[in-house]
Structure formats: structure tokens, C-alpha cells
Amino acid sequence: MGKIIGIDLGTTNSCVAILDGDTARVIENAEGDRTTPSIIAYADDGEILVGQPAKRQAITNPKNTLFAIKRLIGRRFEDEEVQRDLKIMPYAIAKADNGDAWVEVKGKKMAPPQISAEVLKKMKKTAEDYLGEPVTEAVITVPAYFNDAQRQATKDAGRIAGLDVKRIINEPTAAAFAYGVNKVKGERKVAVYDLGGGTFDISIIEIDEVEGETTFEVLATNGNTHLGGEDFDNRVINYLVDEFKREQGIDLRNDQLALQRLKDAAEKAKIELSSAQQTDVNLPYITADATGPKHMNIKVTRAKLESLVEDMVKDSLEPVRTALKDSGLAVGEIDDVILVGGQTRMPMVQKTVAEFFGKEPRKDVNPDEAVAMGAAIQGAVLSGEKTDVLLLDVTPLSLGIETMGSVMTALIEKNTTIPTKKSQVFSTAEDNQSAVTIHVLQGERKRASDNKSLGQFNLEGIRPAQRGLPQIEVTFDIDANGILHVSAKDKETNKEQKITIQASSGLSDEEIERMVREAEANAAEDKKFEELVQTRNQADGLVHSVRKQITEAGDALPADDKTKIETALSELEAVIKGDDKAVIEAKQQALLEASQKLMEIAQQQSQAQGAGADANQSSSSSKADDDVVDAEFEEVKDDKK
């Protein structure tokens, strides 16, 4: 069996590693570098350049040189982050037919997985050159906070590159592998702070070594998949543009060639300021006007850089606090802090993290290489080459379906260990309903519309019956890659429908963070809404029950009582969709009081029909009601099919 290679597919740089004996080894590429720029360029002669060759020609070919594609993978064109990138990227971001964010090069639209596949191909070739044999299998890393669409798109990129992606593994977890395998003795609680080129993750991981076997259990994870070194670079670029405009009166934002040179200079300045107190950005002939050529010469100090990015560094601590809270650990219980990602080389980031955790981060983990090394270890575990490592990872967000009253009913809670499978029985909301719509959601809010819709599908052919009787079993299955599969089955007919959430219905990072943030900020509002929905559902059930009893009572119900009940019914139905819980409860009580005579008649009729047979029927009905959860499923009309 061939080697399963480990690939860190990064926003700025990528890296490939293998397990050599008992040690993970990073492989140098054809240029002799241990990391490869995640840059792809399309030359005029049709040649596709990847890595350093693409980066070298970027200044003269800005529109056809693609970088930071990971920020687009699995995203919708309308996403706020994509719209923001649209204004600063020198290449064209286009809207695909399915609404995804694609790029346009030389008049041709291309999907992000298609472009990322070019980087993966280079990683594959790098490994093949080193091993002297074909490589067909890989473990690829993704940010822990990547959603279902982004994970699926990453897997697609691997497939396009000719790789069988055996596992998608979270970047902080992979870094913990690189740190913990063969090194940790006993039990350690570790915080992995991963600030890369385009994404930020924090994972709290418990590493437990017993008799040579090491278990890695992710206790909680959080992050921001649109915060990274690229954003730091953009702050520097904007500062340089503003300074140049102030000095020369020329705005460079519309000059793609100048912007590409600025990007290169900003990145270099940022890196230099990690070891120096100041640097000069010197770009001769940056532009020209009627008076002649213009040159840029701007001094940037470390203090200035820190003032430009201070808010982003502070923002990174919010997900850290959330992850700690979700893990049930206090800051003082963290034994080790590991820094991953090139941006963590910035002294301000290191100082901020050290002050937060009250301890210096470890220096024995290479922030650029640890993730690929961990992926290689996972590859060796999957191939059976390494048997003394166990990984227990988690899903970052809750997953569920929309149920009666537009409520999000979670089947799998956030930070649940994966792979996992969970089933729950739901039922119909209307009598004789022949079809239901399963609406899959991702997020932390109670109101369905406040969460992200991942997709929906219909289950048809349900046997006509009273509402609440059909039993629809909904199953959520998250595989080890964190990718979701949903199925619904009518337990009586065994008819089943399945769906794998596709990248076209991806969830944007901003939406994820907004959902979690709002869930915490609006906990009281969520509880109030949940109580309102419960009251509405109770009222709806009462209306249904009373109408049925009126029909069954027939002429036995006096006309005066019937009129009172009909009036109370109308008044309750008029307020049932409103937002005032107290009003609904009052009208509900009024209907109960008006229905006293009706209930007496119903009881008399029930006794007359024979206690024995009715008791059995009642017991059966009660059991069915206990086993199901009312769900809001729309009946699929013929004109919708």
C-alpha cells in the first residue's frame, strides 16, 4: 500500500509531509522550499504556474494571478466577505450559475476547488518526486471552523487533483498531533491558537498518553474563517495607499499593477517588522501623472503596524473565550499553548496570547509546518502504519431541522464528537398529509430563520392519517470529515429520502460567527420566542381538538353552546399567529371555558362506546403521541411537484 500523504492546503502557503519511520517529515518542493505559495497564475501561452514561479510574475500579470482562493472555497457570491474581497482583489470574482463565488480568468469562469486543485497537484508531485512512486491518497487539512460546504469543496479539490481524500482533518488538531505524538507523557490540556493567512481557529484539546497509546480529544473549537494574515496585509496596503494619496494626491486603488506591487511590499514589510523596529517601503515608479513618474518611499514602524491591526488581534480572543467556556475549562487549567500559522510570528500576537493564558507559548512547534506534519501522522493512522494514536474530533456548530412554529430543533449539538449519528422521530402537522419537507439547518438560534438553511428535500407517499400519527424518522449522520448526510424515512411504509449537503448551499463564515454571537447575546430573546412557540402550538392543538369534538358531538351540542365555542375559536385563531403570549393564553383559557359542555358530551359518548375498546385505543394513541415530536412539514401540492 502506498503512502497517504499529509497536505496543509493554506490560504497563503501550502505544505506536504509524510511519515518517515516514526517521524513526520516535510518534503521540499522543486524550488527547494519546504512551503509553497498558494498562488496560481495563467500565462498568455496557456501555461499554468503554481507556487514561487506564479508569485514571481504576479506584479506583471495581476488579473490572471490567483491567490487566497481558500477565502472563496465553498462560499456564496453574495456573502459579505466575498463582496469585501471583491473590492481589493486584483483578479475578477464572478457569480456562478448556482450562486457560488467563482473567479474569472481570461474570460473563463472557474470554481475555487478547480484552482485549489492546481496547488494540490504540485503537493502531490512534490511527494511523488521524493518517494519515487505514484501517490493517490491524502489527508487534507481545513480550518476547524470550516462549514459543511467548505469541507465538501476541499474534498472536491482533492478529487480534481487526482487524490482520494481519505480524511479531512481540522488544522489545530493536526498541529496538536505534530506536538503530541511521541512527545507528551501523561495528560496535557492544550490550547492551539491557529492564525494563518486567511483563517483563525482555536481548539482546546486534551492529550492523554497511557502506556504508549495517545488519545487526542477535542473538547471545543471556535474561530473566524475570515481573519488572517491577508487581512493584516490589507491594513498595511490601505495605510500605504492613504499615505501616498496624502503626499502625492494620487489614489492607487484603481491601478491593479500598483496594487499588486503594494501587496508584495506590504507582506514583506509586515514580515520584516517581526524582527525589526522599522522598515522602508520603497517602490520606484509606482505610478505616473502629467508631471512625470511617482515613487513611493514610506517608513513603517512596528508601533504603526501594531496600531493598524490591534483590533483584529484583540478580536481573536473572543473565539478563545468561547472555546474555553464550551470546554468547561478555566484559563489556568491549560497546560500548554501552541501557536500555529505564519501570522503568529508577529510579536504582538505572541504577547497578546501569552498575556491571555498567563504563560509563554511553546517554541518547539514550527507554525508553518506543524499542520502538514500532523496530517501525515493521521495518514499513517488511516493506513495502519501507526496504531498508537486515537483522534476524537468535534463538529463546530449545531445541526437540526425546522419544526412546528418555525423552531430549529437540533439533532446534533455543537462540539459533539464525530463521527456521529443521531435519529429522532417526528410527525405530520396536518390531517391526511401525504408529504413532508425536511428543512436542514445549521446554527445556534431557536428561530429557524435566524439559522442558515443548508438544504431541503421532500419525503412523499405518506399514508393519509390524522396528524401526529405518521412516524417520520429523521437521521443526521456526520462522517469523520465533518460532512453531513441526512435521511428521512416513513417508518410504516419504509419509504426513504436522503441528501448529502452540497457546496452550492454553503454557509458563510460571517453567518456562523453572527449566529453564535447572537445566540449568546440574545439568549433571553431566544427563550422568550421558544415559550411563545410552545404556547402557539398548544393553542393550535386545542383548536384542532375542539373542532373535531364539535363534529363528533353533532346535534347533541346545544346551538347556544356551539355559538359560544365558535366565537371563542375565532378569537383564538385571530391571535394565534401574534407575538403576545399572554393574549394567546387568555383566548385559550376562554375557549376551554366555553367548551365545558362540549367536553361533557364527548366524555358521555366515549363511555357509551365501551370502556374496554376505547381504553386500548386511547392507550395506543397516547403512546404514539409520546413518541413523536410535532414538526412543521408542508404538504407538497401537485403544482409544486
Swiss-Prot record:
Residues 627-641 have a biased composition (Acidic residues). GO terms for molecular function: ATP binding; ATP-dependent protein folding chaperone; unfolded protein binding. Keywords: ATP-binding, Chaperone, Nucleotide-binding, Phosphoprotein, Stress response. PROSITE patterns: HSP70_1, HSP70_2, HSP70_3. Residues 600-641 are annotated as: Disordered. Induction: By stress conditions e.g. heat shock. Pfam families: HSP70 (PF00012). The modification Phosphothreonine is found at T199. It comes from the Bacteria. Residues 602-622 have a biased composition (Low complexity). CDD domains: ASKHA_NBD_HSP70_DnaK-like. HAMAP family: DnaK. Acts as a chaperone. Belongs to the heat shock protein 70 family. This is Chaperone protein DnaK. It comes from Aeromonas salmonicida (strain A449). The lineage of its organism: Bacteria, Pseudomonadati, Pseudomonadota, Gammaproteobacteria, Aeromonadales.
